[in-house]
């Protein structure tokens, strides 16, 4: 037992536990986030006796007499300062890390009123952010320090919130102060806690399950196995190949497969009971590598499949082999990229209960509430299900697949009680799909002037235990491997193999990040052969408006690759002139699904009784700022002011399905739907209707992005409605060999909110600095992956270089007011630019990631 103060109130503990659990589970101070419970991420940072501390580390018995402060304990003045500073800087995206960052800010400014940038970075060094790249968080601390010094908040600037305005996101306040709720922040009366027993082996047949001992444990209310599932057992994003629970006689596919579920009155009891479930297995040989998977006599990951091939793509235009044969210069090489973990700060969590309509209601953190609804309904065998997005603590593709939502819903269905199902960080690292490792052989031919004549490639990817989005990822990797250049002859073969490793699926860049590394590295090598700079070879080959891409699509006048090259040119040439090692990479990335797949955005605008216009869309806001984008769309296309607009989080009973938040599609696809809804609303206003007349009327619109299927028999297929383009430059410090600066120029069409665009660029760059230099997701020969968040190799605030984010504002696209999403492309060209910079420094080409022999390399 211990007695201490929390936010000025005396508290007394009844049992020894981690401070994090006491603050959240007993005091319900939910600004203190549980990101890892291993002392790594910093999301649970509080202040103890004036110093920051991760609340998941100390036991309460050791805190007798201490004074603890959480975000809930800030003064009214501090709340205003930090909300203003973090909003003004654009420092908030998903928001999960922000309360911890605010605590670090307060602890610093309480003792240092004028911190230097290095002191700010040092104060933030123990806290991870996966969204922002830290740049704007550092800016926020600097702004807060200035306001604290001056003792007064700046006067509000009358920002009109039109497209192009640098505005603070609409959800800044609730994320800075920790009042917004993620699923784990819900504590319901009578709530049970779920836990899963997962497979002991990557590939085995389940022979029997004995749950007797688990059921006998006091506090356990249910132990659920496959026979208890009322609907379909198998689910999956595109292909229903993943068991909800492995049945007796069923085959496990990886160590993350759930065998049974427990619902208990507390989490400790649920976890203990899961370990008491006894499972008899027939252990079978497993597949760990694609080489093993490709053997004719290999064990099959799926009983029902003919082989271990998940997807195969062959794309060809022109005659690549002949063009390469006739080229002046030809270069071939093998490239490899690794598994990568999304490392979003919020572990997966869902809370479910029966609502007053008798429906199973699920609070979810996902990238599509309607997809969650579909798969939960399949498992429960009923359409009496509702899904509501709570705040989503980052996704990057990793929350497109089901992980806990259907399990929580199933436990509620069985017990008739509220249930919280949350993955531990180790479970999260195991269960959700990762970035595919790619193995690529690529050949490029050029003429004497460096003009690309043809490219031929063969790639293979490990898609792990399930299909997930492996097929579309492979397809996008192949279609974009040609690069953003103007030439005709291109051929690529791609194969994705099943293994018994954790599944691979969507990840920021969607396969393009991997093939871009190979293509851009070959182009840098080709520049040396031709005798021109890597910048020049790109400028000569860059796709320009009304030219034809290697896939046959004629691009329009919104195409801005040349502008991105010209934007980085001054710093690129200055670095060369100064004798610095400098590398460069370009990229393009589709916005929207494309290739003939139906891609629809939908929006409802409704004046409610409060006389405010409410925005309803089934698109998930996962940190990219969709609610702010739609708000700016409305202000720009109507006479409605910002203060009269309310953005509602995605749900499945009012908000129309707008597809997944992926593929940089929501700004463009749902943004255009919103613009069309605005047109309908303004027709009524122009006809003389007042707000009172319009209350309850639904202004619904949708936008279907029409494209041609892959391989369509047309001369110039429209594969995608839009592409974003980018050029990034890496400059190394001549003394230390570390990155001095990344210059990142991105064509965003019309920038809806330049502040948010910069934040997306900075976050994507830092994510791929990690991809290029240090991040690892090792999987051992028994298909067991890393289990510690702190061992992933993520970059921290004090390690990031200067990032010059250049937003190229080039309208021209005829929909969504010219806006193109940039969430994915920001991370694509970084790695090849960094790799080329290190070649310029030491003359050693590196063909696999993370790069070896750099100052950032982790040994062992």
Language model features: what each stretch is:
Residues 1-156, 595:
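Signature of N-terminal electron-transfer/Fe-S-associated modules in redox systems
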Residues 46, 174, 180, 184, ...:
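Short beta-strand elements
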Residues 90, 165, 171-177, 238, ...:
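Glycine-rich loop/linker segments at domain edges
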Residues 145-309, 330, 414:
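Flexible, low-hydrophobicity surface segments
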Residues 226-227, 381-383, 414-419, 473-587, ...:
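C-terminal catalytic domains of large/alpha subunits in multi-subunit enzymes
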Residues 258-259, 264-266, 417-464, 671-691:
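Phosphate/diphosphate-binding loops
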Residues 320-379, 475, 585-612, 617, ...:
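Conserved beta-alpha junction segments in alpha/beta enzyme cores
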Residues 395-416, 420-421, 626-633:
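Thiamine diphosphate
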